[in-house]
Design a protein with these regions (language model features):
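Extracytoplasmic beta-strand-rich oligomerization domains located immediately C-terminal to a leader/signal peptide
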Residues: 53-98
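Intrinsically disordered, low-complexity regions enriched in Pro/Ser/Thr/Gly and acidic residues
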Residues: 89-178
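N-terminal leader/signal peptides at the extreme start of proteins
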Residues: 1-8
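Soluble periplasmic/extracytoplasmic beta-strand elements of cell-envelope proteins
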Residues: 82-85, 160-162, 183-185
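Non-catalytic, surface-exposed connector residues within folded enzymatic/regulatory domains
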Residues: 36, 60, 77, 174-175
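Aliphatic-rich helix starts adjacent to a transmembrane/signal segment
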Residues: 11, 16, 20-56
Length: 186
């Protein structure tokens, strides 16, 4: 018969060696799942925002709905929400040029819209944030590209919601993106 007293020490040593590897694996799976959840949440918020403003809900009401939608994405220093309505200009210097006729952003997170960043002073205030001079103000022109080569026709509107947020991390050593961005075009 063998003496099992020496084997108990070996098992404890093997457990001590494998425990950090198993913990890293478990925490990595949890972090990756949490990151996927955050991506899904931001995408869902962008889609819901565009859905609301496409149904002629005021931008203020859409903003309030999105702020109550999630406790994880708060539109403060860590997140930004941008609502835009894009149309073709109907006259003046912006005739047949895609322009942002309505625009409102919430939050202080440094983010740039894919459509461009016209000054907030070019737009009226609450509740709908219409452009003051959509026919002649060159600063409200779309400077980015619309998705998939989308072209506007006269009288057509594209409702865009963009959500930018700083991703929160459970495990700091995972090389996942620090910023999440989602946009929805309706």
């Amino acid at each position: 018969m063998r003496d099992r007293r020496h084997e108990a020490g070996q098992a404890l040593f093997e457990f001590g060696v494998t425990l950090p590897i198993l913990m890293a694996l478990v925490l990595g799976v949890i972090e990756f799942g949490y990151a996927l959840f955050q991506v899904q949440l931001v995408t869902s918020m962008a889609r819901e925002g565009s859905n609301l403003i496409a149904r002629q809900v005021t931008i203020n009401d859409a903003e309030a709905a999105l702020q109550t939608m999630s406790g994880l994405v708060r539109f403060d220093a860590n997140s930004t929400l941008i609502f835009s309505v894009v149309r073709l200009g109907v006259g003046g210097a912006n005739n047949n040029v895609p322009i942002i006729v309505q625009r409102h952003s919430v939050g202080a997170f440094a983010a740039s819209s894919v459509l461009g960043d016209p000054p907030q002073s070019a737009y009226q205030g609450s509740p709908d944030y219409y452009a003051y001079d959509p026919d002649n103000d060159g600063s409200i022109r779309v400077s980015g590209v619309l998705p998939n080569g989308f072209t506007l026709t006269p009288g057509e509107s594209v409702y865009v919601t963009e959500v930018f947020t700083q991703r929160t991390s459970i495990v700091p050593f995972m090389p996942l993106p620090a910023m999440l961005h989602a946009s929805a075009y309706f």
